[in-house]
């Protein structure tokens, strides 16, 4: 069994093999899909300056829980939990940016969180036959005024 440092050193070389594995186990589009992203930190924030394995590839990113240094894994799954498409991007990539590339072979409804909310993206996906369903951010809600007596 290889040591941790040897395993970390081999990660960049194994990216192609992992991509081929994921491509071979992809599921079929069922009309109901879910999009999300998750951070993949490659080192602790205190060690960013000393990190050399993914130097020039990994970037600093921010999530709802704080800052990290590494990558973002963007995944779209169907309602059965099968992976339909995925991309690995630097940590500073906006969630909305890789979405048009991820949905090339999809149709139907795509559920996503607030990170994917954009009027222009929703319109772009609608022209491609995909209905993007997201939560409503507070800025986009209509102000409902009520009278209190």
Indicate where each model-derived feature is located.
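Short alpha-helical elements
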Residues: 1-149
């Amino acid at each position: 069994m290889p040591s941790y440092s040897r395993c970390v050193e081999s990660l960049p070389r194994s990216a192609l093999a992992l991509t081929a594995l994921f491509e071979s186990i992809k599921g079929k589009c069922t009309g109901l899909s879910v999009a999300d992203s998750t951070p993949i930190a490659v080192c602790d924030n205190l060690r960013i300056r000393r990190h050399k394995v993914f130097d020039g590839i990994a970037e600093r990113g921010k999530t709802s829980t704080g800052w990290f240094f590494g990558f973002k894994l963007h995944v779209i799954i169907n309602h059965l939990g099968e992976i339909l498409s995925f991309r690995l991007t630097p940590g500073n990539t906006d969630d909305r940016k890789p979405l048009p590339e991820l949905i090339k072979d999809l149709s139907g409804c795509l559920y996503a969180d607030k990170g994917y909310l954009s009027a222009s993206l929703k319109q772009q996906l609608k022209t491609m036959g995909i209905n993007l369903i997201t939560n409503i951010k507070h800025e986009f809600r209509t102000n409902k005024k009520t009278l209190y007596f």
